[in-house]
């Protein structure tokens, strides 16, 4: 009898592991999802679906070098909004980041990095982005611009 009760309790605990409620996506307000579209100051509102897709693609393909918005190869330049704004040309808007993912350049804009940084222009060198669509690039750029609003340590801090 004791074994039967223990088996019944174990069975209930086992099945409770699978009876979870579906997780709802984090609902972000419109202000959080509003990012710069271009250098003229136009803005766009990124959808939650775009942010989710951008995050998935970023984690899948970019975090090897850009974990939490930092840059593994150069700790002085991150994906924080201040660093993106300080680049030449500024990369603190969606269209500039999409352009960078197509034609990467150095932080000062002087050198072409198409053979050094992952991009969609050279799938022969960087197959990671081979299947990225224009929408995927837009989603990743949107995520990179929304991420600092969600994580105070995105791009690094004086402590990390």
UniProtKB/Swiss-Prot annotation:
Cofactor(s) needed by this chain: heme c
Keyword entries, A-Z: Electron transport, Heme, Iron, Membrane, Metal-binding, Photosynthesis, Photosystem II, Signal, Thylakoid, Transport
Family note: Belongs to the cytochrome c family. PsbV subfamily.
GO biological process, any: photosynthesis, light reaction
Residue sites binding heme c per the record: 62, 65-66, 117
NCBIfam families in the record: PS_II_C550
Signal peptide positions on this chain: 1-25
Membrane topology type: Peripheral membrane protein
GO CC list: photosystem II; plasma membrane-derived thylakoid membrane
Coiled coil: none
UniProt name for this protein: Photosystem II extrinsic protein V
UniProt KW Repeat keyword: no
Species the sequence originates in: Rippkaea orientalis (strain PCC 8801 / RF-1) (Cyanothece sp. (strain PCC 8801))
Cofactor note: Binds 1 heme c group covalently per subunit.
Gene Ontology molecular function: electron transfer activity; heme binding; iron ion binding
Subcellular location: Cellular thylakoid membrane
Top-rank taxon, per record: Bacteria
Record's function text: One of the extrinsic, lumenal subunits of photosystem II (PSII). PSII is a light-driven water plastoquinone oxidoreductase, using light energy to abstract electrons from H(2)O, generating a proton gradient subsequently used for ATP formation. The extrinsic proteins stabilize the structure of photosystem II oxygen-evolving complex (OEC), the ion environment of oxygen evolution and protect the OEC against heat-induced inactivation. Low-potential cytochrome c that plays a role in the OEC of PSII.
Subunit relationships: PSII is composed of 1 copy each of membrane proteins PsbA, PsbB, PsbC, PsbD, PsbE, PsbF, PsbH, PsbI, PsbJ, PsbK, PsbL, PsbM, PsbT, PsbX, PsbY, PsbZ, Psb30/Ycf12, peripheral proteins PsbO, CyanoQ (PsbQ), PsbU, PsbV and a large number of cofactors. It forms dimeric complexes.
């Amino acid at each position: 009898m004791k074994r039967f009760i223990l088996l019944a309790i174990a069975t209930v605990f086992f099945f409770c592991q699978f009876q979870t409620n579906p997780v709802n996506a984090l609902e972000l307000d419109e202000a959080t999802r509003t990012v710069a579209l271009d250098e003229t100051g136009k803005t766009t509102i990124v959808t939650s679906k775009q942010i989710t897709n951008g995050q998935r693609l970023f984690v899948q393909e970019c975090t090897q070098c850009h974990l939490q918005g930092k840059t593994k190869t150069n700790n002085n330049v991150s994906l924080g909004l201040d660093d993106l704004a300080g680049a030449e040309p500024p990369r603190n808007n969606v269209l500039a980041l999409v352009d960078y993912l197509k034609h990467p350049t150095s932080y000062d804009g002087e050198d072409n990095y198409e053979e050094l940084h992952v991009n969609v222009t050279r799938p022969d060198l960087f197959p990671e982005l081979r299947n990225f669509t224009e929408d995927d690039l837009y989603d990743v750029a949107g995520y990179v611009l929304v991420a600092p609003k969600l994580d105070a340590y995105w791009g690094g801090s004086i402590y990390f």
